[in-house]
Amino acid sequence: MSKLFWAMLAFISRLPVPSRWSQGLDFEQYSRGIVMFPFIGLILGGVSGLIFILLQSWCGIPLAALFCILALALLTGGFHLDGLADTCDGIFSARRRERMLEIMRDSRLGTHGGLALIFVLLAKILVVSELALRGTPMLAALAAACAAGRGSAVLLMYHHRYARDEGLGNVFIGKVSGRQTCITLGLAVIVATVLLPGMQGLAAMVVTLAAIFILGQLLKRTLGGQTGDTLGAAIELGELIFLLALL
């Protein structure tokens, strides 16, 4: 199980993980690592939250919010943001399904993808700033949001089909069992409620899960399934929705 954790950490982040820590693990086994997603989100969000706390007293809340969101993007190598941009480029092209999937494969950034990146990043910075001004514990909020975003992405894997013939997302989409889905969602809920006691964390988690479930159904209807890009979009939007729900 420890090998799966290190493999997942290296897979969805840019944190330096020695290859020997996940040595001998077959790529096809990665689907079992979905249960690690909330914990990986907890780590990434915790680092981002620490950066916010360290910078807040030095440069103020707005700049601290800017740098903690920038750090989060760098920690993931922009992996999920790229998926968000590609998904929006494809979906909002208003073309046929096959053409949408082709556009999503294009490495060039389109207008809709650019607008989506601007909106999501700016919204995160503004929401983090507002939460801090309201006295929300930001280390806990950011760690919980990242755990919620990654945990809720399992809703786009279970009982969904892969929209393409091949790709990274095929490792998870349609390969996750009901038991793994329940464990992943349960862990995300536990992380959120422990870090944000009372109804605040639980309520934000419920809102996030409902929103991502609806997103998954809309994407399924539009694309005929899910891709690695739509998983990235779900993670980014899940983080934002969780933070918004804390307001």
UniProtKB/Swiss-Prot annotation:
<feature type="transmembrane region" description="Helical">
    <location>
        <begin position="138"/>
        <end position="158"/>
    </location>
</feature>
<dbReference type="GO" id="GO:0005886">
    <property type="term" value="C:plasma membrane"/>
</dbReference>
<keyword id="KW-0997">Cell inner membrane</keyword>
<keyword id="KW-0812">Transmembrane</keyword>
<feature type="transmembrane region" description="Helical">
    <location>
        <begin position="59"/>
        <end position="79"/>
    </location>
</feature>
<comment type="function">
    <text>Joins adenosylcobinamide-GDP and alpha-ribazole to generate adenosylcobalamin (Ado-cobalamin). Also synthesizes adenosylcobalamin 5'-phosphate from adenosylcobinamide-GDP and alpha-ribazole 5'-phosphate.</text>
</comment>
<feature type="transmembrane region" description="Helical">
    <location>
        <begin position="113"/>
        <end position="133"/>
    </location>
</feature>
<keyword id="KW-0472">Membrane</keyword>
<feature type="transmembrane region" description="Helical">
    <location>
        <begin position="171"/>
        <end position="191"/>
    </location>
</feature>
<dbReference type="GO" id="GO:0009236">
    <property type="term" value="P:cobalamin biosynthetic process"/>
</dbReference>
<dbReference type="InterPro" id="IPR003805">
    <property type="entry name" value="CobS"/>
</dbReference>
<dbReference type="GO" id="GO:0051073">
    <property type="term" value="F:adenosylcobinamide-GDP ribazoletransferase activity"/>
</dbReference>
<keyword id="KW-1133">Transmembrane helix</keyword>
<comment type="similarity">
    <text>Belongs to the CobS family.</text>
</comment>
<keyword id="KW-0460">Magnesium</keyword>
<dbReference type="Pfam" id="PF02654">
    <property type="entry name" value="CobS"/>
</dbReference>
<protein>
    <recommendedName>
        <fullName>Adenosylcobinamide-GDP ribazoletransferase</fullName>
        <ecNumber>2.7.8.26</ecNumber>
    </recommendedName>
</protein>
<keyword id="KW-1003">Cell membrane</keyword>
<dbReference type="GO" id="GO:0008818">
    <property type="term" value="F:cobalamin 5'-phosphate synthase activity"/>
</dbReference>
<keyword id="KW-0169">Cobalamin biosynthesis</keyword>
<feature type="transmembrane region" description="Helical">
    <location>
        <begin position="34"/>
        <end position="54"/>
    </location>
</feature>
<keyword id="KW-0808">Transferase</keyword>
<feature type="transmembrane region" description="Helical">
    <location>
        <begin position="194"/>
        <end position="214"/>
    </location>
</feature>
<comment type="pathway">
    <text>Cofactor biosynthesis; adenosylcobalamin biosynthesis; adenosylcobalamin from cob(II)yrinate a,c-diamide: step 7/7.</text>
</comment>
